[in-house]
From Swiss-Prot:
It comes from the Bacteria. CDD domains: GT5_Glycogen_synthase_DULL1-like. This is Glycogen synthase. Its EC number is 2.4.1.21. Keywords: Glycogen biosynthesis, Glycosyltransferase, Transferase. ADP-alpha-D-glucose binds at K15. It is an enzyme of class 2 (transferase). Belongs to the glycosyltransferase 1 family. Bacterial/plant glycogen synthase subfamily. GO terms for biological process: glycogen biosynthetic process. Gene3D superfamilies: Glycogen Phosphorylase B (3.40.50.2000). Pathway: Glycan biosynthesis; glycogen biosynthesis. It comes from Lactococcus lactis subsp. lactis (strain IL1403) (Streptococcus lactis).
Amino acid sequence: MKVLFASSECAPFFKTGGLGDVAGALPKELAKKSEIDSVAVILPYFKNEMKEEYRSLLKDEFYDFVDVGWRHEYVGVKSLEKEGVKYYFLDNEHYFGRGQLYGYGDDGERFAFFDLALCQLLEKLDFIPDVLHVNDWQTAMVPFLLKEKYNWIKAYEKIKTVLTIHNIEFQGLMHGDALSELFGMGMERYFEGVVRHNGMLNMLKTGILYADRVNTVSPTYAKEIQTSEFGCGLESILQYVDGKVSGILNGIDYDIYNPENDILIPYHFSEEELSGKGQMKAELQKRTGLPLNPNVPLIGMVSRLTNQKGFDLVLSQLEKVLEENVQIVLLGTGFPEIEEGFRYFSQKYPDKLSANIAFDIQFAQEIYAGSDFFLMPSAFEPCGLSQMIAMRYGTLPIVHEIGGLKDTVIPFNPISKEGTGFGFVDFEGQILVETINRALEVYGKEPEVLNKMVLSAMSKDFSWGTKAQQYIELYQEL
């Protein structure tokens, strides 16, 4: 089986979020599986975002021209091979030679070009896949283009398509005329309403309808987006195609996130030998200026500071939490009012709260490794990786039971005394405080139970190898 993975970002070359992590990890794991003959990834060439160590490895394959409306656009194809995966980069200075990946007024046109170029160049690449796996709105038009614009190419007839939705909030909206002016197609599908949604061309909706399978990054999120609360206006479309919608959890890279040999932390530990975790806690207290005390429960937070991540809720209840015997370390940037709120409370409670308004990968690893608990109260969370990383490092998540958080964290059961974290269902301040207090109570009164939970969390398998096998099963169903 040949698989082509199409994405707008991919670690380690360039990424802004979870999509980049998936595009970096999943193809690499697929390449190790006996069912897969070859795997390739196709990406825009964001040269300004790519480190020289990778740019220097690129090989020029060929160039061509793609019609994007009235523009006759150059496209250069570069490639490199890494860990069993061939990566193709589509180069165009006008569209991709910019300072960042997204956030421009012509983003729709930029990815229309990418999707058209991808479809046009498959034959020349000499890589006709059995499965073409596209991701989010940026590549969601590809299944439509294969079936409506390039259906005359015999070599494409047997290609099956999978669309993964990483976050349904972002849908790729353009004026309806874009169908003819950019994609060079007739307007029939727009006027019929197939690709139209609320008076706009909706690229994600188009992909949902035309892909052979649609999946999301957790089973719970696959169900949630079929409701008005989480569907962002596309819930009725997803209900209509419910039979082809499913969810597979993302994984984490166990080579990178390994408490036994993580190069970003000074002390190491394992399920068999946990003493290094206590040393990491002391190191974290030292770094943040919090009192050195092994017996005070320490809650870590590493996140974008936004309402989606639940930090407006946290701020509204933070003083109540800080009145308890607790230490909190926060790392992240985001909404100015949330940043300011944490700064205020860190000045008011300097011995209890360390607010670090920054982005620092090494510091993040120290928080994952040195904390007792990890607070992740997201309002919605398609998958989430932080809770998996925390558990890998023996740090128990405190989560809103939503999306991928619900699928990955087993909430503490006070009867059986089992779980891999603590959870709350109702997104309310008082419930959040009660859940945190429950975790603090177990920490203070039931250390044996807590230790058992830590070991249970560390033993969970969130590796990409397991997830890759689930994707192979999905591909085989096509």
